[in-house]
Amino acid sequence: MSNQGEYPEDNRVGKHEPHDLSLTRRDLIKVSAATAAAAVVYPHSTLAASVPAATPAPEIMPLTLKVNGKTEQLEVDTRTTLLDALRENLHLIGTKKGCDHGQCGACTVLVNGRRLNACLTLAVMHQGAEITTIEGLGSPDNLHPMQAAFIKHDGFQCGYCTSGQICSSVAVLKEIQDGIPSHVTVDLVSPPERTADEIRERMSGNICRCGAYANILAAIEDAAGEIKS
């Protein structure tokens, strides 16, 4: 009769089966030989060559712009947008960075008289161009008629989009005056008329998150009578 508390032979503490992953001396020699062979097939120089090269330094270009009537000489990274050149290099921060994807119009400026989203174009593409920002339209003592109309009709709330709205509004009236049609122009032979629908369509690329659209339209219609060709 077995003593109480005595375990069977195969279940005694410390009794284990050999580990399946045990490494013998023969296996160790095989692994060492394989490692040495790999070093011959893939020498250090080949492995080093596969490491990506360091990022090259940015290309810098001289750039001449005529901004708000003043000639500016810059040296910019060729990847710099016109928006960043105006804000970071020339410190003209009236032009706002909104979406930075050309979808809100907050960065609208006038380039050679035409409106442009400054975040969508590279500065070096405008060598020698004449650029007008909100700072160049008027001054606190001598407001542009469009600036005065926006104030008169409360064409803004938070004001973040206002510089782009005003620059775009000035260009819209010039487009209509020059006979450039829009998507809602009915008669493509005759010059387009300055209707509310025409203005709304042409201003649709400028987003006002505060929703001051009715007042913006009123401001544009008011200023149109004062802006001369």
Curated annotation (Swiss-Prot):
The lineage of its organism: Bacteria, Pseudomonadati, Pseudomonadota, Gammaproteobacteria, Enterobacterales. Residues 1-21 are annotated as: Disordered. Its EC number is 1.2.99.6. Pfam families: Fer2, Fer2_2. Keywords: 2Fe-2S, Iron, Iron-sulfur, Metal-binding, Oxidoreductase, Periplasm, Signal. Residues 61-137 form the 2Fe-2S ferredoxin-type domain. One of its GO terms (molecular function) is metal ion binding. Residues 1-53 form the signal peptide. GO terms for cellular component: periplasmic space. It comes from the Bacteria. [2Fe-2S] cluster 2 binds at C158, C161, C208, C210. [2Fe-2S] cluster 1 binds at C99, C104, G105, C107, C119. Its cofactor is [2Fe-2S] cluster. It is an enzyme of class 1 (oxidoreductase). It is found in: Periplasm. It catalyses: an aldehyde + A + H2O = a carboxylate + AH2 + H(+). Residues 9-21 have a biased composition (Basic and acidic residues). Exported by the Tat system. The position of the signal peptide cleavage has not been experimentally proven. Its main location: periplasm. Binds 2 [2Fe-2S] clusters. Oxidizes aldehydes to the corresponding carboxylic acids with a preference for aromatic aldehydes. It might play a role in the detoxification of aldehydes to avoid cell damage. This is Aldehyde oxidoreductase iron-sulfur-binding subunit PaoA. It comes from Escherichia coli O157:H7. Heterotrimer composed of PaoA, PaoB and PaoC. The gene is paoA.
